[in-house]
């Protein structure tokens, strides 16, 4: 399947593909399944019947059993609609715009809201940082690093490949200093401040496979990982803390925190029962699951970044975590913000 072009806007995704030799004679619905692996057969059939799939120089709408032939061009249109709505216990969640923190030459620094992806992937085609700023600046935008979809906070983007490559190299070679704010359940005292150095890896025999396991620091299993943790506030059954990852493993902060007895608030994967994650994934989460999580996403926020040639960037706390801390812990957010800014500047400078 040869891609002729892709175009993304916050409301419409357009793509054009050329049918290749090995695809000659395929049914249209089976051909489309290659591009939409997360779509059900019924969703693909609806796209065809709604005229969102068009074979060049043929009348449309087509039928699912229409055949495609070598060198034909197939145009696919995907309007945003309800495709990326985020629901929590039956209620639609707000999806706010990212906040531009700084634009310095070809570097863009933004405060990414929760549930926004870095760039289009899977079924997430619209609520993406690169798509938003390409539409905003009418210019191609490149990602420099990636944040998990649920993780909010500082996201770096570039306006040209050279700048993206330069700063990506800084991330990959450990020249970027990072700070994350987190809210966690207090199940035991890990002895703040401390360094977590357990190694990490996936276990392909474990379900869900995305779960990252910890292994002893002197183990031959997994890959080395290092996170420093610092306590900000201990209140009721919760810790508010800062994490400073020294390596960049997948789920590193969440995995180390859970292993040391303080799983993140709202973490469906590392809360002690991974089947909760599967129920949310399959959209069959129970009332008890929602009550256990308390909030729709894990409470992790990229709050500070220091590039080798820049001052420290510090992001405001996200609206959803602020709301929870006010209503559940009755915290003075201004005082907390000042504490975070002071600690992060001292640590990253």
Residue ranges and their predicted role:
Residues 2-349:
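RNA pseudouridine synthases
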């Amino acid at each position: 399947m040869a891609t002729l072009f892709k175009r993304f806007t916050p409301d419409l995704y357009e793509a054009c593909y050329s049918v290749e030799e090995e695809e000659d004679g395929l049914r249209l619905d089976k051909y489309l399944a290659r591009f939409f692996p997360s779509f059900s057969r019924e969703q693909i059939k609806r796209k065809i019947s709604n005229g969102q799939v068009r074979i060049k120089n043929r009348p449309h709408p087509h039928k699912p059993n229409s055949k495609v032939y070598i060198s034909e061009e197939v145009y696919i249109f995907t309007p945003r609609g309800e495709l990326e709505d985020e629901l929590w216990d039956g209620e639609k969640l707000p999806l706010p715009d990212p906040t531009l923190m700084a634009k310095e030459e070809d570097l863009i620094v933004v405060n990414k809201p929760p549930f926004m992806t870095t760039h289009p992937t899977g079924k997430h085609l619209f609520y993406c940082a690169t798509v938003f700023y390409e539409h905003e600046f009418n210019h191609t935008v490149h990602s420099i690093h990636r944040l998990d979809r649920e993780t909010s906070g500082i996201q770096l983007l570039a306006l040209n490949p050279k700048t993206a490559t330069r700063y990506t190299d800084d991330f990959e070679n450990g020249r970027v200093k990072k700070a994350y704010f987190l809210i966690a359940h207090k199940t035991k005292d890990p002895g703040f401040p401390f360094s977590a150095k357990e190694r990490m890896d996936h276990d392909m025999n474990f379900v869900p496979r995305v779960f990252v396991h910890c292994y002893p620091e002197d183990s031959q299993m997994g890959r080395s990982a290092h996170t420093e943790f610092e306590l900000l506030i201990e209140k009721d059954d919760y810790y508010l803390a800062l994490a400073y990852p020294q390596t960049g493993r997948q789920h590193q902060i969440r995995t180390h925190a859970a292993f040391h007895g303080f799983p993140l608030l709202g973490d469906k994967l590392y809360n002690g029962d991974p089947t909760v994650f599967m129920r949310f994934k399959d959209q069959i989460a129970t009332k008890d699951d929602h009550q256990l999580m308390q909030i729709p996403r894990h409470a992790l926020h990229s709050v500070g970044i220091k590039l080798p040639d820049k001052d420290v960037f510090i992001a405001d706390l996200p609206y959803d975590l602020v709301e929870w801390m006010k209503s559940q812990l009755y915290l003075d957010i201004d005082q907390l913000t000042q504490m975070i800014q002071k600690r992060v500047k001292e640590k990253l400078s």
